[in-house]
Swiss-Prot record:
Stored Pfam families: NusB
Gene Ontology terms for molecular function: RNA binding
Annotated GO biological process: DNA-templated transcription termination; transcription antitermination
Function in brief: Involved in transcription antitermination. Required for transcription of ribosomal RNA (rRNA) genes. Binds specifically to the boxA antiterminator sequence of the ribosomal RNA (rrn) operons.
Family: Belongs to the NusB family.
InterPro entries per the UniProt record, alphabetical: NusB-like_sf, NusB_fam, NusB_RsmB_TIM44
Keyword Transcription: yes
Entry's transmembrane regions: none
CC terms in the record's Gene Ontology section: cytosol
Cysteines joined through disulfide linkages: none
Recorded name of the encoding gene: nusB
Keywords of this entry: RNA-binding, Transcription, Transcription antitermination, Transcription regulation
Keyword S-adenosyl-L-methionine attached: no
Native source organism of the sequence: Colwellia psychrerythraea (strain 34H / ATCC BAA-681) (Vibrio psychroerythus)
Protein name per its UniProtKB record: Transcription antitermination protein NusB
Length: 138
């Protein structure tokens, strides 16, 4: 089964955030390149842009939400795991139309696809704790 356009947008957003973290290139350049490089793929461009811009613009508050629930400094977290967590936390905070279970499940699936073997367990644990702070009403 093909991934939905929104799932593909999340996947590309994680890759773009990773690229931004590692390269320190301007976000606009990364965004333009990702859209151009993936022009033939079916994905939700607006959602991709929302996630990428949202993470890079709100990085301080996103990291503040993550820090209490990790057992090491953010700089010591694998770059892929960090990108996944940042996209998911932004989505939890700012995309309240998306159920938190969907956000966490998508992040787990991304970790299984792109990160180290047991990364999905780490991502799940951090997000499970973070969601209680961000969306206590759910």
């Amino acid at each position: 089964m093909k991934p939905s356009p929104r799932r593909k947008a999340r996947e590309l957003a994680v890759q773009a955030v990773y690229s931004w973290q590692v390269s320190k290139n301007p976000v606009n350049d990364i965004e333009v390149n990702f859209i151009a490089d993936n022009s033939k793929r079916r994905f939700d461009i607006e959602y991709f842009q929302l996630l990428l811009r949202g993470v890079t613009t709100n990085i301080g508050s996103i990291d503040e939400a993550i820090i209490p629930y990790v057992d090491r400094p953010l700089d010591d977290i694998d770059q892929v795991e960090k990108a996944i967590l940042r996209v998911a936390v932004f989505e939890l905070k700012d995309c309240t139309d998306v159920p938190y279970r969907v956000v966490i499940n998508e992040a787990i699936e991304l970790a299984k696809s792109f990160a180290a073997d047991d990364s999905h367990k780490f991502v799940n644990g951090v997000l499970d704790k973070t969601v209680k702070l961000i969306r206590p009403q759910e």
